[in-house]
Amino acid sequence: MRGAMLNPIVIAAGGTGGHMVPAESVADELMRRGQRIVLMTDARSAGQKSAVFAGCERHVLAGAGLAGRSLGRRLLGVAQLARGTVAARHILAKLDAAAVVGFGGYPSVPPVLAAATLRRRPAIVLHDQNAVLGGANRFLARFADHLALSFEGTVGLPGRARATVTGNPVRAAISVLAASPYEPPAETIRLLVLGGSLGARIFATLVPEALARLPEGLRRRIALTMQCPGEAIGAARGALDAAGITHELAPFFSDVAPRMAAAHLLVARSGGSTVAEVATIGRPAIFIPLAINTDQRHNADVLARRGGAFRLDQATTTPDRLAGVLESLLDDPLRLAAMAEAAASARIEEAAARLADLVLSAIAERVR
């Protein structure tokens, strides 16, 4: 029967970790349920190591983003997407896929478009990681059987979309720490600063300058762990040493999950995955969204409205402004504990299982 193990489920995802992490989580859940998974991705992600997709058939498709590009680059991007769609259609027809699950971004466009044109059309499910529906998903929603959302109240939904809030699947290392008890700081204050896949350059100057403005007694209590671009580590270390801040700096931490669970307060960007991880573990946060990304502002507001986070806009956040917020929070452990509880209230349990259920339900609808 179509939809059983011989008919694979195609995962269409690529680009950044924000798209790949939920794709991996759901693929892992579906494989544990006996489903065969095929990955369709882009050249950027083709070489990335993934324990989940290591044994899966994978296909690298042509494609390119269109937003913010010149007319010439857009025309070239359209041509690449068309080429990727033709290739995806041939592959999907040969596979007789039961479903295509897209995770946003341009790598999802060719497989979903191709699926929509097949005579034996597979089920199409789209997942969006942000509180604002992304451009690719807005375009593809007209072809989807179901649209899976990470947040209640997601902005930009098409009127006829069959939308279900599943939550944003997070990494297994985060899931096992769900609802870890929060212990307010007594003496040492553990501050964790995350800036995306390779650190945010602005944090490397903003955070040390803000910490230097705190009262000396508070500075002496802080143990800072900060993700920092390699070329900025020297200057950041010098500023932190001068301020008397205990610190650990690196471009990347492989063990972010336990560091997040141990933190008393986070300062971070507010990509969909980061916000989902903060809610899953339940930790207070100061979010400074990427200045050009309205999605991140809306994501941050999901926790800020509940009292679990502060949102500070990058354009108006000076060292003095950040120092003021840090001091008000770090001097008030009961407030931090209340924020942790509020952040955890936004957690959506078993997001990967919920999305897997939706995919299998969409397949069942197609074979009826």
From Swiss-Prot:
Span of the signal peptide: none
Enzyme class: transferase
Annotated residues for binding of UDP-N-acetyl-alpha-D-glucosamine: T16, G17, G18, N130, R171, S197, Q296
Source domain of life: Bacteria
A single Gene Ontology CC term: plasma membrane
NCBIfam families in the record: murG
HAMAP family (alphabetical): MurG
Name of this protein: UDP-N-acetylglucosamine--N-acetylmuramyl-(pentapeptide) pyrophosphoryl-undecaprenol N-acetylglucosamine transferase
Organism this protein belongs to: Acidiphilium cryptum (strain JF-5)
Gene label: murG
